[in-house]
C-alpha cells in the first residue's frame, strides 16, 4: 500500500548529510517512523528533506505532534 498520499514529496527523500563536513543540527522527515528526526547536516549538497527546526519539519511534512516530548 502506498502511504505517501497527501504528503510533500520533499519529505519522502532519504536523509542526506551532504558532502561537506560541518555539523549543522537539522531535522528531516523519516518516512519509516513518520516522525521528524534530528541529524547533522554537512553544509553543502544534500536534498530538500532538510529543515532548520523541528516545528518547520512537522509543519511542512504534516506530522501530527501529539504532545511529543520536548528534547532537552
UniProtKB/Swiss-Prot annotation:
Compartments, as annotated in UniProt: Secreted; Nematocyst
Major localisation: secreted
Pfam families tied to this protein: Kunitz_BPTI
UniProt keyword annotations, A-Z: Disulfide bond, Ion channel impairing toxin, Nematocyst, Potassium channel impairing toxin, Protease inhibitor, Secreted, Serine protease inhibitor, Signal, Toxin, Voltage-gated potassium channel impairing toxin
Prosegment location in residue numbers: 66-72
Domain BPTI/Kunitz inhibitor residue range list: 11-61
Signal peptide: 1-6
Disulfide bond entries: 11-61, 20-44, 36-57
Site (Reactive bond): 21-22
SUPFAM superfamilies with a match to the protein in the record: BPTI-like
InterPro entries in UniProt: Kunitz_BPTI, Kunitz_BPTI_sf, Prtase_inh_Kunz-CS, TFPI/VKTCI-like
GO molecular function term, any single one: serine-type endopeptidase inhibitor activity
GO cellular component terms, A-Z: extracellular space; nematocyst
CDD domains, alphabetized: Kunitz_actitoxin-like
Highest rank taxon of the organism: Eukaryota
Disulfide bond among keywords: yes
Task of the protein: Serine protease inhibitor that inhibits both tissue and plasma kallikreins. Has hemolytic activity. Inhibits voltage-gated potassium channels (Kv).
PANTHER family given in the database record: BPTI_KUNITZ INHIBITOR DOMAIN-CONTAINING PROTEIN, KUNITZ-TYPE PROTEASE INHIBITOR-RELATED
Family, similarity comment: Belongs to the venom Kunitz-type family. Sea anemone type 2 potassium channel toxin subfamily.
UniProt protein name: U-actitoxin-Avd3r
Amino acid at each position: 500500500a502506498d502511504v505517501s498520499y497527501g504528503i510533500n514529496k520533499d519529505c519522502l527523500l532519504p536523509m542526506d548529510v551532504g558532502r561537506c563536513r560541518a555539523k549543522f543540527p537539522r531535522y528531516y522527515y523519516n518516512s519509516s517512523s513518520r516522525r521528524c528526526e534530528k541529524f547533522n547536516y554537512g553544509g553543502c549538497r544534500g536534498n530538500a528533506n532538510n529543515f532548520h527546526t523541528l516545528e518547520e519539519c512537522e509543519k511542512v511534512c504534516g506530522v501530527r505532534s501529539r504532545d511529543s516530548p520536548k528534547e532537552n
